[in-house]
């Protein structure tokens, strides 16, 4: 298993789209169209050229996980596009934790002091993961930054970094 920064590759992009579609629409039944998240088709410009990053996890050259950091300003970043196929979650692989650790290393090295994220209300497994990582749920009116996301009755979480 390898976690690496995304490089423009049509084969990996197609697999990333499959992963996201599986997690959002087949598994979670959220009915989110790729047109609602066109950042996936402009990773370099949307994330990497703006002092953020996008990582993919590969097993035998197959994309099995992803996570992204979107820079909003010098202090705030958004955790986005965090997906893994079910068999890679939890023990024994723990890809979810490995991707999150990579994200946090970059966030701390980049001197962000706050991470925000959104996640659909019905994604209880995600809520549990984020809360175990120190994220606190906030109401939307407490979110003082703006970013685009496919809202599905979403919860907003924040984590302050040391």
Identify the function of each model-found stretch.
Residues 2, 22, 113-116, 120-124, ...:
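C-terminal "cap" of GNAT-fold acetyltransferases
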Residues 52, 65-68, 94-96, 134, ...:
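Glycine-centered flexibility sites
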Residues 33, 92-93, 116:
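A generic secondary-structure micro-motif detector
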Residues 31, 110, 118:
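Residue-level signal for short amphipathic helical patches enriched in basic/charged
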Residues 10, 92-93, 151:
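Short, solvent-exposed loop/helix junctions and linker helices
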Residues 5-88, 100-102, 106, 160-161:
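Acetyl-CoA-dependent GNAT
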Residues 62, 85-101, 109-110, 121-127, ...:
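Conserved glycine-rich acetyl-CoA-binding loop
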């Amino acid at each position: 298993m390898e976690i690496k920064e995304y490089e423009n590759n049509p084969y990996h992009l197609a697999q990333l789209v499959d992963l996201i579609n599986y997690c959002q629409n087949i598994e979670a039944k959220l009915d989110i169209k790729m047109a609602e998240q066109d950042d996936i088709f402009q990773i370099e410009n949307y994330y990497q050229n703006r002092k953020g990053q996008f990582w993919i996890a590969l097993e035998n050259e197959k994309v099995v996980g992803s996570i992204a950091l979107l820079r909003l300003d010098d202090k705030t970043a958004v955790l986005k596009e965090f997906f893994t196929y079910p068999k890679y979650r939890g023990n024994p692989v723990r890809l979810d934790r490995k991707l999150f650790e990579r994200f946090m290393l970059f966030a701390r090295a980049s001197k962000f002091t706050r991470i925000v994220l959104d996640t659909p209300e019905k994604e209880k497994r995600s809520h549990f993961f984020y809360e175990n990582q120190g994220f606190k749920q906030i109401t939307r009116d407490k979110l003082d930054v703006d970013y685009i996301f496919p809202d599905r009755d979403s919860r907003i979480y924040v984590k302050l970094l040391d």
